[in-house]
Amino acid sequence: MAHHPRWTLSQVTELFNKPLLDLLFDAQQIHRQHFDPQQVQVSTLLSIKTGACPEDCKYCPQSSRYKTGLEAERLMEVEQVLDSARKAKNAGSTRFCMGAAWKNPHERDMPYLEQMVQGVKAMGLEACMTLGTLNESQAQRLANAGLDYYNHNLDTSPEFYGNIITTRSYQERLDTLDKVREAGIKVCSGGIVGLGETVKDRAGLLLQLANLPTPPESVPINMLVKVKGTPLADNEDVDAFDFIRTIAVARIMMPTSYVRLSAGREQMNEQTQAMCFMAGANSIFYGCKLLTTPNPEEDKDLQLFRKLGLNPQQTSVLAGDNEQQQRLEQALMTPDTDDYYNAAAV
């Protein structure tokens, strides 16, 4: 049965055209109705298979079609991945995301991927993966292994999409989201600002996401990281207020979703990041390089959290699993500890 669209393009365009301070006020009010405004979800992302991707996404240094100097690596060993997950947990992350540069996973790799998910879950962390398109069987196997979230971004509006990617259709992306949802895995899907798109395209992306039968539980909003060698390396910078506006509109349109401040934070100053949190962002990637692009150092993130009075969010895990989380929060809030300025060391 077809569901009734929650939003129209004219409604979304109206939001984008609102005076910024009015928009931020509305977004913050909606945010406070559904979330604790002082809590931020902290995730770590690990590239478990890097480079040599056959796709032609114009923004991506992992594509085999562009000379970016990135060295291709095989799928990591399961124990290597779990070691990284332990470190992420000890540094305060509550979700561990594993990304592979594939068009889709091979059947021969599925047992290893299942072991990775099971191992991460055994630590009391939420597990997330992004592996490209999935078929029904693969989605179900990952669900049975305990995968909490699957990330598959739409990237931009359907109208602009063909300017950025030609090796995978928009419908293929939507189909993968359907298969993930049907398998009982939560959906993580967002897009990128700065691809050369118009404001109408940003509205079109958020319209697609918010009008899914069930909106994504997690919506990463990325700012383009311009990598030398990719076709978008010389794109114009995104105005910070335009990015903040996109975060705010996402929060208003998807009030119960986590809105993640994702790639591109390295280029943002503290004031821009603070305004993103004010606009309704309540999730960040922390620590490890964001796949193959830089992410702010952990201690910088924790200093910013302290300045803004934000706390890393705890997840519901087995008793005893939140010990590191409590130590992290204590270090954040206690000026006379060695970890006050470098709580990531705990």
Curated annotation (Swiss-Prot):
GO BP terms in the entry: biotin biosynthetic process
Family annotation (Pfam families) = BATS (PF06968), Radical_SAM (PF04055)
The residues that hold [2Fe-2S] cluster are C97, C128, C188, R260
Q: Where is the Radical SAM core domain?
A: 38-256
Which catalytic reaction applies to this protein?
A: (4R,5S)-dethiobiotin + (sulfur carrier)-SH + 2 reduced [2Fe-2S]-[ferredoxin] + 2 S-adenosyl-L-methionine = (sulfur carrier)-H + biotin + 2 5'-deoxyadenosine + 2 L-methionine + 2 oxidized [2Fe-2S]-[ferredoxin]
Question: So which cofactors does this thing need?
Answer: [4Fe-4S] cluster; [2Fe-2S] cluster
Cofactor: record remark = Binds 1 [4Fe-4S] cluster. The cluster is coordinated with 3 cysteines and an exchangeable S-adenosyl-L-methionine.
What pathway or pathways are given for this protein in its record? Cofactor biosynthesis; biotin biosynthesis; biotin from 7,8-diaminononanoate: step 2/2
Gene Ontology molecular function, alphabetical: 2 iron, 2 sulfur cluster binding; 4 iron, 4 sulfur cluster binding; biotin synthase activity; iron ion binding
The entry sums up its family as follows:
Belongs to the radical SAM superfamily. Biotin synthase family.
User: Function, please?
Assistant: Catalyzes the conversion of dethiobiotin (DTB) to biotin by the insertion of a sulfur atom into dethiobiotin via a radical-based mechanism.
NCBIfam families attached here? bioB
Report the protein name in the record. Biotin synthase
From what organism does this protein derive? Citrobacter koseri (strain ATCC BAA-895 / CDC 4225-83 / SGSC4696)
